[in-house]
Every structure is written in structure tokens, then in C-alpha cells.
Curated annotation (Swiss-Prot):
The gene is pyrF. Homodimer. GO terms for molecular function: orotidine-5'-phosphate decarboxylase activity. This is Orotidine 5'-phosphate decarboxylase. InterPro entries: Aldolase_TIM, OMPdecase, OMPdecase_AS, OMPdecase_bac, OMPdeCOase_dom, RibuloseP-bd_barrel. Belongs to the OMP decarboxylase family. Type 1 subfamily. The lineage of its organism: Bacteria, Bacillati, Bacillota, Bacilli, Bacillales. The active site is at K60 (proton donor).
Length: 233
């Protein structure tokens, strides 16, 4: 059964601990983002790993190639399962990131590495006016996806709305990791390109990241099980 990735959008380990305790020791897939990592440092990864959870470390690195390479050497040593960069950093940067992960992993298992295409909070209008990208949103996402594949990365972060086109372009094994997932009863909040877990499954996502629909639910375990059911029907 494919597990959804739970976005641990908290500031403190105490909040994380209280949340994870609700799942009675079940091994989960979780995302540690900027808020949690920058507030607590690398120790937060170690503490969560001790509970046998898989970790997607979502720091979206974007810098010159050598800096990203050096950073990835360090991140690989944390023992996380997946990391990411911004595809906008370019092919050379992504290749350097991959090289850094391989160096940092040594003889151990290398974390998967994926690249962010366009954020799910980005609309086509804002992309065109603020980023001065004059293509369609889909064309931009496909361009970044092809670049990511050429650099040898495992896949991309994308909206589920682009997942099938990315699959057709890059093959079924190329990961399409999809945030912006909400249960039908939940508000979209600051996300724009959102879908339900069921729709994400039907239109080509390989992995889904779910935050507020689970973490802010009155009963997080029940919400998680609902997401799990929709994602695996």
C-alpha cells in the first residue's frame, strides 16, 4: 500500500512528537520542511528517524552548483530518504546536487532527489507577470521536468494537474511528487492548483504530500486513513 507523505508543518519537536504519538508507533512517510528544520536543526531528522519514519527533507535548495553540491554532501549524511532542489537553478546545479548526494552517501543508500518545477501556489498569470515566463504553466513545468530528467534526478515536485503530461514526457518511473492535496471537505488555503487524493491517483501522481487536511483535522488518524483509502483504491 502506498503511503501518503504527511507534511509536518510544525515549529517544535514537541508538536511533532504529540502528533506522531497519535499513530501508535506506525511507520509513516513524513515531510520535514523549512519551518521545522530551520527552527530545530538537523537533530529533528535524527529524532524522527529513530521512530522508523521515512523522511522527505523539503529544503528546495537553489544556489550556485558548488554550494548546492557541498550542502547535499551534508544532507546525505543525515540519513533522509528524499531531498529536493529548485529546477530553476539549472541543469549544472542539479547535476552538482546529485554528485554531492553520492559523495555524502558513501557506500550507503543514496537519498532520492527531485526538483521543484512550479510551486502549487503559482498561477499561470503570476508566473507570466512576476517570473517573466511567457509560455503556459504546463510548458514551463514540462521544460523543467525534461531538464531534471537530463540531469539524472529521480523526478519532480509538481501539481497533479501536470502529472500525466510529465509521465508521457519522461516515463512512468520518473517520480511525480504532488503537494497541494486536500480532502474534498477542506479549504484550499494558499494553494491554487489543488486536487483530492483520489484525483491525484487517477491523473498520474506517484506520491502525494498532504499537510493541513491531516495535521489540522479534529481526528488526524481518521483523516490520514481517509487519505490512505482514496490514494489506494
Amino acid at each position: 500500500m502506498n503511503k501518503p507523505i504527511i507534511a509536518l508543518d510544525f515549529q517544535t519537536y514537541e508538536e511533532v512528537e504529540q502528533f506522531l504519538a497519535k499513530f501508535s508507533g506506525e511507520a509513516l512517510s513524513v515531510k520535514v520542511g523549512m519551518e521545522l528544520f530551520y527552527s530545530n536543526g538537523p537533530i529533528i531528522v535524527e529524532k524522527i528517524k529513530q521512530q522508523n519514519h521515512e523522511i522527505f527533507l523539503d529544503l528546495k535548495l537553489h544556489d550556485i552548483p558548488n554550494t548546492v553540491k557541498s550542502a547535499m554532501v551534508g544532507l546525505a549524511k543525515l540519513g533522509v530518504d528524499m531531498v529536493n532542489v529548485h529546477a530553476a537553478g539549472g541543469k549544472n546545479m542539479m547535476e552538482a546536487a546529485l554528485e554531492g548526494l553520492e559523495i555524502g552517501s558513501g557506500s550507503g543508500k543514496r537519498p532520492k532527489i527531485i526538483a521543484v518545477t512550479q510551486l502549487t501556489s503559482t498561477s499561470e498569470a503570476s508566473m507570466q507577470s512576476e517570473q517573466l515566463i511567457k509560455t503556459s504553466l504546463l510548458e514551463s513545468v514540462l521544460h523543467y521536468s525534461a531538464l531534471t530528467n537530463q540531469a539524472g534526478l529521480n523526478g519532480v515536485v509538481c501539481s497533479a494537474l501536470e502529472a500525466e503530461a510529465i509521465k508521457q514526457q519522461n516515463g512512468a518511473d520518473f517520480l511525480r511528487v504532488t503537494p497541494g492535496i486536500r480532502l474534498a471537505s477542506d479549504a484550499a488555503d494558499d494553494q491554487i492548483r489543488v486536487v483530492t487524493p483520489e484525483k491525484a491517483r487517477l491523473i498520474g501522481s506517484t506520491d502525494i504530500v498532504v499537510g493541513r487536511s491531516i495535521t489540522r483535522a479534529n481526528d488526524p488518524v481518521a483523516a490520514y486513513n481517509q487519505v490512505l483509502k482514496e490514494w489506494n483504491v
